[in-house]
Amino acid sequence: MARISGIDLPSNKQLKIALTSIYGIGRTRALEVCNKSSISPSKIAKDLDNDEVNRLRKVIESDYVVEGKLRSEVAMSIKRLMDIACYRGVRHRKGLPLRGQRTKTNARTRKGKRKTVANKKIASK
């Protein structure tokens, strides 16, 4: 089983799909990595030998930001937005959508489960 960037690649999948299990590598980037390391993207991950795994590891670690480092970069950029208190940072802090979506009726994913107000109908009479 190949282990790259602290992630065990799924052994029964094609390399172009198996590489997408690494955070920061999608389909397009997986194909780029395969081309740079001169390995067939349709090769099954369990059929890789140590030389090919080392080439993949070298390409990924030298050219791309993946896994923990990428997660920390994303978290730091969100924290920076919150610290400077720009519009996006304030929306992050409040847990609301950032990009102008309506919030009167939708945005349930971002806002979370409904919080009902007790006796609201009685008070409105």
From Swiss-Prot:
Any single Gene Ontology cellular-component annotation: small ribosomal subunit
UniProt GO molecular function: rRNA binding; structural constituent of ribosome; tRNA binding
Region Disordered, annotated ranges: 95-125
Keyword field contains Methyltransferase: no
Keywords on record: Ribonucleoprotein, Ribosomal protein, RNA-binding, rRNA-binding, tRNA-binding
The keyword RNA-binding is assigned to this record: yes
Record's function text: Located at the top of the head of the 30S subunit, it contacts several helices of the 16S rRNA. In the 70S ribosome it contacts the 23S rRNA (bridge B1a) and protein L5 of the 50S subunit (bridge B1b), connecting the 2 subunits; these bridges are implicated in subunit movement. Contacts the tRNAs in the A and P-sites.
UniProt similarity note: Belongs to the universal ribosomal protein uS13 family.
Protein name: Small ribosomal subunit protein uS13
Record organism: Borrelia garinii subsp. bavariensis (strain ATCC BAA-2496 / DSM 23469 / PBi) (Borreliella bavariensis)
